[in-house]
Amino acid sequence: MKKTILLANLLILTLAIAGCGTNNNSANSSKSGNAAEAAPQASAEASAAADEPAKVTKIVVGTGTGFPKVCFIDENGKLTGFDVELIKEIDNRLPQYEFDLQTMDFSNLLLSLETKKIDLVAHVMEKNPEREQKYSFNKEAYAHWRNRIVVAKDNDSIHSLDDLKGKKVLTGATSAEAQILENYNKEHDNAINIVYQNGAANDTVSQISSGRVDATLAADFVLPIIDPQNKLKAIGDELSSADILYVFRKNDADSQKLSDAIDGAIKELKADGTLGKLSTEWLGADVTATTVK
């Protein structure tokens, strides 16, 4: 009888142990199954994320059409020039952005930037204290030049700003050259008669050579571009020298991010020689260097 009871107890114990083993195996099997099912799902999600195109931010670039060799419409109706082709090259090197060029009068560019109609200005813009008060600039200059007085070839009476007192001097509204003249007038009781230009840059030659105005101020590279017939001349010492940069909205995080990205692209363009080649092709000299060659 005791033997029978003992055998019965041993049988119950064996079944209990077997049951525990079965539960553990089931749990492990369940975990393995879940992991096996989760792995392909995670792989599929990762693959989908990899296949999803990176986000591209559209950037509206403001430029002009009236500056020969810089930003103008060619004989085929195409917008081109140094600034235009350079910004296209920068766009090619920044896959996270897509640049959309919008043209407008030069005098409207900075206002359009302020009102967020455009995101940056590309129009050989000089950095100066007046502009720095309202706008932000990238750090890596893509050109550098000097401003001087420009007069008719046969004019030997003008050599300095003081000689422009009582004279008509042509300049573009909101330009760096206009600010030189306006600052002079603030200190000299509006001695210079500033005439703000409405036409294209090459209209300067006809206005000066015809005597409608007496002079203008221009960067050193500009003269051979707008005056191939050599009717004008640059005289006197340089009035200012400046880095040429892109202009952005101030205190704007997205603008700063874009500015930093453009700086990186310009460094690449300088390093591989592309920037210098574009300058020589369009402007006749490498004005990307500190000293014009």
Roles of regions detected by a PLM:
Residues 15-19:
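C-terminal motif of bacterial Sec signal peptides marking the signal peptidase cleavage site
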Residues 48-51, 55, 97-100, 176-196, ...:
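Ligand-binding clefts/hinges and TM-proximal coupling segments of bilobed small-molecule sensing domains
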Residues 48-124:
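Extracytoplasmic small-molecule ligand-binding "clamshell" domains
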Residues 65, 143-151, 228-264, 285-293:
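Periplasmic-binding protein-like
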Residues 84-94, 155, 162, 174-175, ...:
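Extended ligand-binding regions for polar small-molecule ligands
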Residues 99-111, 156, 194-206, 242:
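Short helix-initiation/N-cap motifs at beta->coil->alpha
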Residues 100-163:
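Acidic, polar ligand-binding/catalytic clefts
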Residues 108, 125-134, 180-185, 206-241:
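A ligand-binding cleft/hinge motif common to bilobed small-molecule-binding domains
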